[in-house]
Amino acid sequence: YNTYLDRADAAVRTHGDVSFSQGGSFYDALYGMETFGLVPEEEMRPGMMYADTLSNHTELSALTDAMVAAIAKGKLRKLQSDENNAMLWKKAVAAVHQIYLGVPPEKFTYKGKEYTPKSFFESTGLKASDYVSLTSYTHHPFYTQFPLEIQDNWRHGMSYNLPLDEFMEVFDNAINTGYTIAWGSDVSESGFTRDGVAVMPDDEKVQELSGSDMAHWLKLKPEEKKLNTKPQPQKWCTQAERQLAYDNYETTDDHGDRKSTR
């Protein structure tokens, strides 16, 4: 909720140069919990405002994308405010998000104890500084930090840049020693599945898909989807191949293949 409002504000202040859309980066979660706090899921349960079990932001985004674009990219010479100088567009965007997501509670009771979002976050013992974001690209020096240049990284969260082989060594070590990993990828990649497996099929070696253009997951036929959930030839990308895919737009926003460990 708060991240949506912050992103809308950034989009309007930059006249649309900052994108406003669904999604974001892992840094949004870290920034959000330290800045705004946390609440138990039952306080703002996904889908609770429209009797569903999971969040479905399609309709919400259709409304708010249009609202933010009308202000950020419109031809209005002056934006309206109320008697307290609060911008009316902000109040309107916040109201729509509250209708679809719920109103963030100022206080709530959890297991017999009263909390605010900030005090509940503090009670968890979580620290944003315990998490680190890693990436691997050659257009910045290795062993330095930089904000990955994708639209969803609009808060300019920093990532440590490692050579690809070291990047994977850290990944494997994190798993083997019990640390948590969040891997940034996207459901429109051909190797995405909802069965707990992600692969990068080798188009040339996967004979069962011979003649296919490896359409995005949502366009694959059921029999084609099954091919991504069983062992098959995979492509092991080199540093140069990874960089080229980023540079030529083959893998861009939402396809950052970034991970964070703690």
Residue ranges and their predicted role:
Residues 261:
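Conserved small/polar residues in nucleotide/adenosyl-binding loops
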Residues 5-258:
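Predominantly the structural core of cysteine protease catalytic domains
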